[in-house]
Amino acid sequence: MKISDFMLEYEKFCPKELAVEGDPVGLQVGNPNDELTKVLVTLDIREQTVAEAKALGVNLIIAKHPLIFRPLSALTSMNDQEKLVLDLARAGIAVYTSHTNIDVVTGGLNDYFSQLLGMTDIEVLDDEEGLGRVGNIELTELSVLTEKVKASFGLDRLRLITYDHNLTQKIGRIAICGGSGGKLWPKALEKKADIYITGDIYYHVGHDMLSAGLLGIDPGHYIEHAFIRLVADKLRSFDMGVKIYESQEKTNPFYDI
């Protein structure tokens, strides 16, 4: 089986056309005509995941976050990104990126997050780009919801966006968007969410949300590591006789102390 055959099968589930405009998805490094040996699924491509791929003998990495987000003007090993690209090319390891298309697609990452939180009557948060989800839950105290979010995403801590620290208030409708979805908070308000869950919420955005009457939970960007299990399981379901590995390397740059 060639890498191109594998890509074709994956794109039946998660078409590249679903990606947000300008988002680099698809094959970024490597020859699609190479024979496929083994696959590693990871959130990020960093030095440790490249080393992991080499040790496992894979020749295709499927990553959530693009290795090349902006066009490269040179390949000189003068910065970390160029070094990674050259290292992968020399090792014969191809890179395929599935970024916002896995967020948008039905059965993708945002649907998975919604299921983890027990949301019902789920709809799309941003109707224009397809990002995020909104849904209902049984009326739940904020304190209980925060614990559920931590348990669902394997977190020790999270940031709660509220002024009064009232953890007894009831939540019945949730908006959620994996990654960095701060700009979509007005959409959550429009769809009558009581609380918006997303990563990388800026200080002033938090003020704006609260002034508009919208609570928030920032669980961090790294909850997207759920991509690894979700996509690996999907690839295994294709039953194409290719070994699929889930990356064991931690690529979260933040460490809570």
Curated annotation (Swiss-Prot):
Residues that, per the record, bind a divalent metal cation 2: H65, H221, E224
Gene3D superfamilies, per database record: NIF3 (NGG1p interacting factor 3)-like
Keyword Coiled coil part of the UniProt annotation: no
UniProt KW keywords: Metal-binding
Domain of life: Bacteria
SUPFAM superfamilies: NIF3 (NGG1p interacting factor 3)-like (SSF102705)
MF annotations from Gene Ontology: metal ion binding
Residues involved in a divalent metal cation 1 binding: D103, E224
Cellular component per GO, a single term: cytoplasm
NCBIfam families reported for this sequence: YbgI_SA1388 (TIGR00486)
Subunit structure: Homohexamer.
Similarity field: Belongs to the GTP cyclohydrolase I type 2/NIF3 family.
Name listed for the protein in its UniProt record: GTP cyclohydrolase 1 type 2 homolog
Source organism of the structure: Lactococcus lactis subsp. lactis (strain IL1403)
Lineage: Bacteria, Bacillati, Bacillota, Bacilli, Lactobacillales
